[in-house]
Amino acid sequence: MSYNIAVAGKGGTGKTSLTGLLIDTLIHEDKKPILVVDADANANINEVLGVEVEATIGQIREEANMTEKRGNSFPGGMTKAQFLQWKLNSILVEGNGYDLLVMGRSEGEGCYCFVNGILREQVQKISGQYN
């Protein structure tokens, strides 16, 4: 049986520390694989987990938008949606017992609309592989 666990609260209250401890506990109790999603604009769960993040969902969104703005085509004749899916698969960080996706910065002041949509779709597609 799989579960979704969300940790939310005000800044500086220990959400990242709690999440790191929770992930560690779940791994030690063999409740893996785990999909960790850091949806904070100031994401840093990777530092607690000791892994490096190459890119965020926000960064690949920017890359796709710039490709379109310049009038360039996506590699291999891909659509924007296919390009985003391909890039999302490439930014998934594989850790010991968990995988990590990082959302990154918002589109603009207070707006996470497009990034949240991408994140939601990606999580729905791959969540069946995780506990």
Model region roles, listed by residue range:
Residues M1-Y3, D30-K32, N96, Q129-N131:
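Short coil/turn connectors at secondary-structure junctions
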Residues Y3-A41:
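Walker A/P-loop phosphate-binding motif and the immediately C-terminal alpha-helix
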Residues G14-K15, I45, C111:
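Secondary-structure boundary/capping motif
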Residues L21-L22, L49-V53, V115-N116:
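Short, glycine/charged-enriched secondary-structure capping and boundary segments
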Residues I27, G50, V123-S127:
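Signal for well-folded cores of large energy- and translation-related assemblies
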Residues H28-N96:
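N-terminal phosphate/diphosphate-binding loop that engages ATP/GTP or pyrophosphate donors
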Residues G76-N131:
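Phosphate-binding/switch loop-helix module in NTP-utilizing enzymes
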